[in-house]
């Protein structure tokens, strides 16, 4: 695998962990879903700490990864619209999915801004 693909996969994993860990670390409501109910728990239970961790993940990715910052930002939340689409096709009701995906884009913006800040930090550090 090329470095770019590894970095995008790393962004996906770190982004999902940043969103999921605060949800699972506290008491949360368990939701039913046609596909991966655990993902619905994450989507319905996102907390401000989740977004803060997503920003920190973006900063770390921006410092250490070479992929474009917008790719890192989108990659960090790519699991959310992917889950939403699969869940829709399996019969769940996502009648407000355009709004849902707009919110996911705002989450990606959080991570992208973090990655841009990480790039600025990397330029200031002498390796």
Residue ranges and their predicted role:
Residues 39-54, 99-110:
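Alpha-helical transmembrane segments of polytopic membrane proteins
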Residues 3, 60-74:
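Membrane-helix interface "capping/anchor" motifs
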Residues 14-25, 74-88:
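Aromatic-anchored segments of alpha-helical transmembrane domains
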Residues 53-61:
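Hydrophobic, membrane-inserted alpha-helices
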Residues 82-105:
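Membrane-helix boundary connector in multi-pass membrane proteins
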Residues 4-10, 108-127:
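Membrane-water interface at the C-terminal end of transmembrane alpha helices
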Residues 13-49:
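Hydrophobic transmembrane helix segments
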Residues 7, 72-76, 80, 103, ...:
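Alpha-helical transmembrane segments of multi-pass membrane proteins, especially transporters
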């Amino acid at each position: 695998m090329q470095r770019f693909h590894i970095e995008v996969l790393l962004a996906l994993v770190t982004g999902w962990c940043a969103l999921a860990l605060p949800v699972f670390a506290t008491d949360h409501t368990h939701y039913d879903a046609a596909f991966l109910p655990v993902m619905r728990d994450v989507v319905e239970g996102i907390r401000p700490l989740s977004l803060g961790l997503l920003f920190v993940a973006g900063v770390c990715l921006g410092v250490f990864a070479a992929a474009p910052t917008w790719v890192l930002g989108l990659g960090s939340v790519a699991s959310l619209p992917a889950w939403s689409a699969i869940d829709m096709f399996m019969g769940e009701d996502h009648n407000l999915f355009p709004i849902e995906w707009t919110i996911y884009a705002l989450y990606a913006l959080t991570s992208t801004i973090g990655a841009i800040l990480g790039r600025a930090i990397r330029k200031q550090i002498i390796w």
